[in-house]
């Protein structure tokens, strides 16, 4: 792969015949995908014109490669622009042409040549059981390779739920002792990008942000970028109105399902899952699981794999009940008023009865018979 890291992104794009207009359009799309607005387009353009491409080392532990499969389908920006122009992806044993001894020589060369300058991207996690022998890369335990690469990295990106939380290979009883990367690398800044897999446009946007601003994006307390993990899927879901109205799918392919009602009762984990699925969507913004008729699995949340069936809801959440009609609300209000009037009438009658008894008692004390008895 190209190791000319002094070339800027803009120079690489121009070398490929990309016009200035197309470059600025790319910067505008990048700003939009990052949620920065059009005002930040000039800053992104300046950064991509003047800053050398950042070398990236991408390594794989226990995983299924779904993060890479997702990343190469990025549309804003395109994965080819990220890989071939925005960054210098010098090592990735899935995408690179080299293999075996040649690949390991490239790995060692990058670590020494760009020590302290490269970004380490980790897909999958290291198993610690049996001295790490459950995952071997380059003839040695993956945990050794991860620590070796992390030592000279400026920052680490933990791609996917595997690297961020452990995922299915860490499911109970976790015989391989699969461990999230932040539990074994504790002296480097780590950006967690969970999801099984993460959204491709989120992956490329995070790289764009780090290249543009020379810093990590703002993170939440769990280490996730707030720009993409700051809200629940439920908060922006197009079926949210049905949730608020108490309109739910009760069984697959019932009339409510055909009407697009809320999937919460079918096990949707959207109310407890932080991700950008309902806003960014997948496949270039075409759709996401809930839009396709299936509830969210909560795959970007820690421990989702050990929380029971995907089709049972975790908790009961009270709804607003906005499905009530004006007549229903009116009858309810009338009932409340009638009840209040009834209670007031009963209370008044009781008070009046008590006053009447007191008056009779007072009158009895002042009667002639009582006066004669007293005399």
UniProtKB/Swiss-Prot annotation:
Q: Where does [4Fe-4S] cluster 1 bind?
A: 64, 67, 162, 196
The entry lists its GO molecular-function terms as: 3 iron, 4 sulfur cluster binding; 4 iron, 4 sulfur cluster binding; electron transfer activity; ferredoxin hydrogenase activity; hydrogenase (acceptor) activity; metal ion binding
User: In its UniProt record, which GO terms are filed under biological process?
Assistant: anaerobic respiration
Record-annotated residues binding [3Fe-4S] cluster? 277, 296, 299
Q: How does it sit in the membrane?
A: Peripheral membrane protein
> Do you know which Pfam families this protein is assigned to?
NiFe_hyd_SSU_C, Oxidored_q6
How is the cofactor bound, in the record's words?
A: Binds 2 [4Fe-4S] clusters.
**Where does the UniProt annotation place the signal sequence?**
1-47
Its PTM note reads: Predicted to be exported by the Tat system. The position of the signal peptide cleavage has not been experimentally proven.
Where, by residue number, does [4Fe-4S] cluster 2 bind? 234, 237, 262, 268
Give me the ranges of the annotated region Disordered. 353-375
Q: Which of UniProt's keywords are assigned here? A: 3Fe-4S, 4Fe-4S, Cell membrane, Iron, Iron-sulfur, Membrane, Metal-binding, Oxidoreductase, Signal
Tell me what reaction this enzyme catalyses: H2 + A = AH2
Question: EC number(s) in its UniProt entry?
Answer: 1.12.99.6
| InterPro entries for the chain | Cytochrome-c3_hydrogenase_C, NADH_UbQ_OxRdtase-like_20kDa, NiFe-Hase_small_C_sf, NiFe_Hase_small_N_sf, NiFe_hydrogenase_ssu, TAT_signal, TAT_signal_bac_arc
Task: Please list the cofactors this protein needs.
Answer: [4Fe-4S] cluster; [3Fe-4S] cluster
Principal localisation: membrane
* One GO CC term on file: [Ni-Fe] hydrogenase complex
Compartments (UniProt record): Cell membrane
**What quaternary structure, including any partners, is listed in this protein's UniProt entry?**
Heterodimer of a large and a small subunit.
- Similarity section: Belongs to the [NiFe]/[NiFeSe] hydrogenase small subunit family.
What is the name of the protein in this document? Hydrogenase-1 small chain
Q: Native species of this protein?
A: Citrobacter freundii
